[in-house]
Every structure is written in C-alpha cells, then in structure tokens.
C-alpha cells in the first residue's frame, strides 16, 4: 500500500487526525448517503428578495457566454480569473479555515481539459493564498498558452501537480478535507471519456465534501444525473443552470460578478444583488 502511495507522489498516508473533519453547527460535515437522501429537492427557480433567479438551459448559458466574449469584449482569461476567485471565495465561506483546527486543510483540485479546468487552476491558486493546501490533478492539459500560464502560476506558488489520484475513495478521504470538482462545465456533451470516467467513479464513493464548479461533472446540464457525484457545495457561475434545481447539497453559491445589467435584462436573469463588495452570493 505504501509503495502505491509513493508511486502516486502522495507520500505516506496521513492519519485522519492530522486533518480533522470540518465541524459545522450541530456536528461534523460528513456528506455521505444519509445527509444526501435527507435533503429536500430544490425545484424551479430560486426565489430571492428581488424575485426569481432564472436557471439557464445549456443553450441559454452558451448564448450568454458568447455575448460576454463577442459583444462585451471580455477575454477568456479575464472571466476565468473572476470565476476562479469566486470559487475559492465560496469555498472559504462554506469551509472556513477556523473549522479545520491548526493544520492547513489539504484540498484536492481535479481539473478537466476545458475552461472549467482553468477555473479550477485559478481557484487552487487563490485557495493557496487564502491559507489552504491545494494539490492539483490535471490529466488532460490543453496545448494552449493560457493553460500553460495557469499551470506555471500554480507551480511558482509551490502547488503540487499529481500524476494520479488515489485509486480508492478511502485514500482520498484520509488525505484530503475537500475535493474540488473542476472537470466539466456547462458546455459538456456526450459520454465521459477516460480517465475521467474512473475519476468520477472514485469521487462517487467519497465521504469528504465535494465542491463542484458551475455544474457537477457528469451531470446533464438540464436534467442532472441521479447516479452521479453528489457535491456538498455547488458554485454556479454567471447564473445557475437548470440542473442546479436537482442539487441537494448543503451550500449553493452564485459567483462571477461580471454580468452587465443590459445582458442580465436581455436574458431576464434576475440576479440578486451581491452584498457589498463580495464576489459571491449564497443562494442556499
């Protein structure tokens, strides 16, 4: 067993006492099957003080993104930085450092090959600045300057890149306090290819919390996936997607405070006002 962990670049298995589980009001956070089944299903759009927040179809989400790039001239790296910062901020609010005791909490960030993976890289960098200890698994990096730069930034900040993830859920549960799902975003379609099919299968057996960026990976953007991963935290970016109505985790945040008011009105997003200068807003 120790030889396997050495092969994975993970070192000796750390005992669970080193990284105590996050303690919430009323007891520990253990997002296993019991808490998942007990959560009520959230149907329809979220009702906020200012009205009903719109949940986007895949087509609507793509149209909003295209207008941000083409009409409003945002760049990909610009929105990626804002989105990744939002994700790290939401994680820090849902799982504050004070919940973990004296040791910096270890966080496994699993990044996919697209922009969602880029959001994860930015998120990891900000988590490091916030005092967490992220490690990244990035098995399918695109050959593009933007992603090369994001990887370099993480490496310069001494964030390790792991060649493999532990092959058993219990190993991840022992080594990490949180897993960030940055594999697939709202534009994903079709069957899940390897190595991500195996990774999602491992994640489906975790008891540590999963934080999903924009959409839980492996879920249909509109219909969800009753047999898919079950995140404890969902960070919807720009606006929530329809699959978020099926989210039954503890924390749902909205991030990506960059939507121009005219674009919001055009698509009737009805986004709630962000508090003060915050870049995230808690929806549940």
From Swiss-Prot:
Its main location: mitochondrion. Undergoes physiological phosphorylation during sperm capacitation, downstream to PKA activation. (6S)-NADPHX binds at residues 115-119, 185-191, 214. GO terms for biological process: lipid transport; membrane raft distribution; negative regulation of angiogenesis; nicotinamide nucleotide metabolic process; regulation of cholesterol efflux; sprouting angiogenesis. It catalyses: (6R)-NADHX = (6S)-NADHX; (6R)-NADPHX = (6S)-NADPHX. This is NAD(P)H-hydrate epimerase. Homodimer. Interacts with APOA1 and APOA2. GO terms for cellular component: cell body; cilium; cytosol; extracellular space; mitochondrion; nucleus. Catalyzes the epimerization of the S- and R-forms of NAD(P)HX, a damaged form of NAD(P)H that is a result of enzymatic or heat-dependent hydration. This is a prerequisite for the S-specific NAD(P)H-hydrate dehydratase to allow the repair of both epimers of NAD(P)HX. Accelerates cholesterol efflux from endothelial cells to high-density lipoprotein (HDL) and thereby regulates angiogenesis. One of its GO terms (molecular function) is nucleotide binding. PANTHER family: NAD(P)H-HYDRATE EPIMERASE. It comes from the Eukaryota. It comes from Monodelphis domestica. Its EC number is 5.1.99.6. The modification N6-succinyllysine is found at residue 140. It is found in: Mitochondrion; Secreted. The keyword Magnesium does not apply. Residues 1-55 form a transit peptide. Keywords: Isomerase, Lipid transport, Metal-binding, Mitochondrion, NAD, NADP, Nucleotide-binding, Potassium, Secreted, Transit peptide, Transport. K(+) binds at residues 116, 181, 217. Belongs to the NnrE/AIBP family. Residues 61-271 form the YjeF N-terminal domain.
């Amino acid at each position: 067993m120790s030889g396997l962990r050495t092969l994975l670049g993970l070192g000796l298995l750390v005992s669970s006492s080193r990284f105590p589980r996050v303690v919430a009001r009323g007891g520990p956070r253990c997002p296993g099957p019991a808490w998942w089944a007990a959560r009520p299903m959230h149907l329809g759009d979220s009702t906020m003080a200012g009205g009903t927040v719109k949940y986007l179809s895949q087509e609507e989400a793509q149209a909003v993104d295209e207008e941000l790039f083409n009409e409003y001239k945002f760049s990909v790296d610009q929105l990626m930085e804002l989105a990744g910062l939002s994700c790290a901020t939401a994680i820090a609010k849902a799982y504050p450092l004070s919940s973990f005791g004296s040791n910096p909490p270890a966080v496994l960030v699993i990044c996919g090959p697209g922009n969602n993976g880029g959001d994860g890289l930015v998120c990891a960098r900000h988590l490091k600045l916030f005092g967490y200890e992220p490690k990244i698994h990035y098995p399918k990096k695109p050959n593009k300057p933007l992603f090369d730069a994001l990887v370099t930034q993480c490496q310069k900040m001494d964030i390790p890149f792991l060649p493999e993830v532990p092959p058993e859920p219990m190993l991840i549960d022992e080594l990490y306090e949180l897993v960030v799902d940055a594999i697939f975003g709202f534009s994903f379609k079709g069957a899940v290819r390897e190595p991500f099919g195996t990774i999602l299968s491992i994640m489906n057996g975790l008891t540590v919390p999963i934080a999903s960026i924009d959409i839980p990976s492996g879920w249909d953007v509109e219909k969800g996936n009753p047999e898919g991963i079950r995140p404890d935290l969902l960070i919807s970016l720009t606006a929530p997607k329809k699959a978020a109505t099926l989210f039954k985790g503890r924390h749902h945040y909205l991030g990506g405070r960059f939507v121009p008011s005219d674009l919001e009105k055009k698509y009737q997003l009805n986004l709630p006002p962000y508090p003060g200068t915050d870049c995230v807003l808690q929806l549940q």
